[in-house]
Amino acid sequence: MKNLFLFCRAGFEKECAAEIQQRAGELNVGGFVKANNNDAYVVYQCFEDDAADTLVKQLPLDSLIFARQMFAASDLLVDLPENDRISPIVAALSDVSKAGEVRVETPDTNEAKELSAFCRKFTVPLRQHLKKSGSLLAQENPKRPIIHVCFIGPGRAYVGYSYSNNSSPHFMGIPRLKMAADAPSRSSLKLDEAFGQFVPKEEQEERIRSGMNAVDLGACPGGWTYQLVRRGMFVSAVDNGPMDEKLMETGQVKHYREDGFRFEPQRKNIYWLVCDMVEKPARVAELIEAWAINGWFKEAIFNLKLPMKSRYKEVTAILETMQTILKENGVTDFKVQCKHLYHDRDEVTVHLWLRPNTAWN
């Protein structure tokens, strides 16, 4: 297969396209991008047959900012007959052997999601035929490749596969999170999703645990503080605005009515620093850099608001500058990740982990 199909948020196709063009080039996989505004997906067509397999194997999905999910894909299947859509799809997947799962998906647009009921019904007979052809195992296996069938319209679909060790576990790359009734704001879901994105399940008990100390800069009214409190942490909430009363009643939150850019923690045993402030992204990055250089936290999650234009260029420039400044100031052991989360809008979420291979005291 010579295409790489990438899911993204509608309206961010240009950013996703610019990113995959650059990252594929770094792996010497030549090709060109096919993308339309508000389609919520991008297709990177490789010049060489089977080159998409190189990308789904060697390009970590977690290293891509704007892609939610990706898979090696066939050319677009068009005019699938209503009386037999299955046969052309099974034929297009003839080179896929013993996959462990099949997902029938759509891009994340209102128009495409009108097909979601059809996709659910279609999955059952398709699964049976794929098992008969040998493309799909009789029993689901999370360690085997995943077959993707993405309908972009009636009778039009891209089909292909991803590898389970380099693929989102979520349908369409979208985690299904529920808004808690007592959460102070919808922004709470951003941090909830970020923890799932940046901290593997098997490490969450160690890295996101009860009793930890955390700081929330720009905390009002407490959407992000809520997620920290829910996990049993003690939080210094920094904001000139008011905090949610129920959060304050937990006894786990101390409210500092201060400017987050001027706040200095009294205690230096902080594990988590979180920050979601409506501010210029470069200024927020500088704030996090200062905290990192001072060694005031172990892990940080923060949002960077995106400009209207050149969003990919701006984000990558800020992240590169951050890494340079940290290294120039003696902070050399760290890991940075960045993702345009499902619950993000015109922003991206960044995770900075200091001394990732050194245990927290």
Swiss-Prot record:
Disulfide bond annotation, renumbered to this chain: none
UniProt-listed InterPro entries: RlmM_FDX, RlmM_THUMP-like, RNA_MeTrfase_FtsJ_dom, rRNA_MeTrfase_M, SAM-dependent_MTases_sf
Residue sites binding S-adenosyl-L-methionine per the record: 187, 220-223, 239, 259, 276
Intracellular or extracellular location(s): Cytoplasm
Entry coiled-coil feature ranges: none
Family matches, as SUPFAM superfamilies: S-adenosyl-L-methionine-dependent methyltransferases
UniProtKB keywords: Cytoplasm, Methyltransferase, rRNA processing, S-adenosyl-L-methionine, Transferase
Molecular function per GO: S-adenosylmethionine-dependent methyltransferase activity
EC class (word): transferase
Main subcellular location: cytoplasm
Subunit details: Monomer.
HAMAP family per record: 23SrRNA_methyltr_M
Described function: Catalyzes the 2'-O-methylation at nucleotide C2498 in 23S rRNA.
Family to which the UniProt record says this protein belongs: Belongs to the class I-like SAM-binding methyltransferase superfamily. RNA methyltransferase RlmE family. RlmM subfamily.
The protein, known as: Ribosomal RNA large subunit methyltransferase M
Species this protein is from: Shewanella sp. (strain W3-18-1)
Gene (name only): rlmM
